[in-house]
Amino acid sequence: MRTTRRNFCSNTALALLSPRLLRAQTKAQKQAQTQAQNQAQGRALPGTASAHADVAAIDHDRILTAAQRYLTQPPAPLTAFPAPNSPGTPNDFYSEANEEKPPTTTGPSLSAPPATSEPAPFTAHSDALLNFSIQVPTLVAAYILTKEARYAEHAAAHLRAWFVAPATSMTPALPFAQLIPGTTKPRLEGILETVQLVEVAQAISFLPRSEALTPEELAAVYVWFATYLEWLGTDRTALLARDQKNHHGTSWLLQAAAFARLAPEDSGGERKVPAPAPSQALAPPPNQYINLNALRHQYKSVTLRAQITADGDFMHELTTPWPYRYSLFNLDMLAGICDLLSTRFESIWDYELQDDPSMRVAIAHHFPYIAHRGTWPHPADITHFTELPLRQPSLLLSGRAYSRPEYVDLWKTLPPDTTDPVVQRTFPIRQPLLWIRRAPAM
């Protein structure tokens, strides 16, 4: 048969399209299998029921009860807690490594203290940052619900103490976080400390219209986050954290995404609420190191491949003594990243690699283990295993993104809070109201 130009073009097109058609058919078959499983287990099919919970109603009493309690607690910045071993200034964040250790039954009786014991690591700054990160989002959530100025004003008082007042504001860098006592070498593990500030950044975007902060104070807060964002993008230790293939790398990306959203638009950021006109001259300069477009590229090209297996596991979390807690921690942070980096024109939630690693696969894989902890197929965590799961925000955010009401229904049934600081530190998204609502424009 004589080869014509038409035959050649047709055969070439068929050869090029065949792999794509095969992948599309495979994906359709997987979707059909998933739907059949859902029907067999009595679950709602995607899109057949509402996956949008009324978070304001669900959390109303919880938020206001906590906010009322926090109104009586004054700001407690780092300078209120002197760190005797810190090589830095009173404004520098300082913490000492406090690695959780497996319980042991060897040696002296566990009921009696050892004859000599090492001093407890210094955690006062970590505790202060944790409390700050719990109180400010709660107060702002209460302001959203009630429009009562007292909540916004008390949140603003905390922000002034931590980010504005020179005498008490925290230095926007972490060279002394999670140090080994007696050393001064920075450690990448320290970057995890400020993942608590992610929800504080979310809360800040709801405050400008409250006028609880003056334009100059608001600009100073923006400058603080812009300066810290630059440090995250240039410091060697911070970049080592960025390149980790586990929750440390995810924490860096979540922080960068949250803080970049407070950056000026001409830096590639998407500040949710622009600084009021009188303070434009005080606004931070464009960040030349980190912007949201670069972070989207990192998520697509690095994070998915490095962290998620084809079946949805986080392989690098499974080798730790806390595979369950760290997997849920990582899942929640990835959900926050997808939420922060998505736009009206591009949903990061829907991005997936050709061999399937994706957020959609990860949440579907972990869903049954959140619903029934006892089915977890890997070793149980050596500590705090029975205190989980909590009301994981990944369920709510993924349920909304993928129209999966069963995720949201499970989220509603789980405990929303914990008082254990160890678990709190791996649960940085505590006020979902700040994530499902968009800050009002100026």
Question: What spans do the regions from the language model cover?
Answer:
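Long, intrinsically disordered low-complexity tandem-repeat segments
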Residues: Q31-Q37
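Secretory targeting signals
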Residues: M1-T3
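Extracellular glycan-targeting catalytic surfaces
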Residues: C9-L21, Q25-K27, Q39-R242, T250, ...
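Long, repeat-rich segments with strong aromatic
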Residues: A258-G268, P284-G374
